């Protein structure tokens, strides 16, 4: 991780891809930028994303191979240049792309003399090979060569205890990690109180997905990891609070919604997410539990609808409307939630 001083200024938080290239079928590279971040935030985001990219993204691998009656993995088969162990190592390197779940079967069945590559693997419809030229074995003589394979989708790195097989079936240490490497750099910008940080993130993948796809999946995994905290029910609500919550004045947002639609600045209501309103976490969580994600969702509700949301109170309604008045550059009607 590198820190450098650079000059620059960014007004709103945004991310973008500043470089993308394909070095080979099994090596993709992407460079991304996120800014502006307050001091310390770049490190927090960089560490979390790096861990998620390397350990939380699923990949598809060959996890087992069955050769027939072969006593151990160091055995050789007549007419084949490689030992069983070398073939297993070659199978381990095969890069697959799929969205399958569970275990799937695949196979190789060819006749020599010839080179066997990844292209010779007979796969289920949901799986494809990233690089069909990857070598597996070299048949020097006119012999039949058949292998039964197992394919699985998982994450991280799995090893299995090896022992002499009775039926010629051997596990393959699978690396379910489509992201090969991740680096991040932090750059400081601005002066005095205006100082902020810019995060640069570099991602290398094995070709089964692009760096942009990997970044998206890692971000989703991090969000899912914190969702249980957002769904935690508030404890200790008093009887008076519950009573007040059940007896609100039943006004609607309809006039306000109409006013917003007539807004000259043309605010896309379905593109404004409630997390952009900077609501308190308790109010925000109430709305999210009710599947209210955008300003369009919110303004389509009546006050009666909102008051039916678990833990939603009159104070929340007034706070929401005050927030809209504060952040939206439009003239809003004066009627609000009354306390």
Curated annotation (Swiss-Prot):
Signal peptide: none annotated. Coiled coil: none annotated. Residues 264-339 are annotated as: Alpha C-terminal domain (alpha-CTD). Its EC number is 2.7.7.6. GO terms for biological process: DNA-templated transcription. One of its GO terms (cellular component) is chloroplast. It comes from the Eukaryota. Gene3D superfamilies: 5' to 3' exonuclease, C-terminal subdomain (1.10.150.20), DNA-directed RNA polymerase, insert domain (2.170.120.12), RNA polymerase, RBP11-like subunit (3.30.1360.10). It is found in: Plastid, Chloroplast. The keyword Cell membrane does not apply. GO terms for molecular function: DNA binding; DNA-directed RNA polymerase activity; protein dimerization activity. Its main location: plastid. Keywords: Chloroplast, DNA-directed RNA polymerase, Nucleotidyltransferase, Plastid, Transcription, Transferase. Residues 1-233 are annotated as: Alpha N-terminal domain (alpha-NTD). SUPFAM superfamilies: C-terminal domain of RNA polymerase alpha subunit, Insert subdomain of RNA polymerase alpha subunit, RBP11-like subunits of RNA polymerase. It catalyses: RNA(n) + a ribonucleoside 5'-triphosphate = RNA(n+1) + diphosphate. DNA-dependent RNA polymerase catalyzes the transcription of DNA into RNA using the four ribonucleoside triphosphates as substrates. In plastids the minimal PEP RNA polymerase catalytic core is composed of four subunits: alpha, beta, beta', and beta''. When a (nuclear-encoded) sigma factor is associated with the core the holoenzyme is formed, which can initiate transcription. Belongs to the RNA polymerase alpha chain family. This is DNA-directed RNA polymerase subunit alpha.
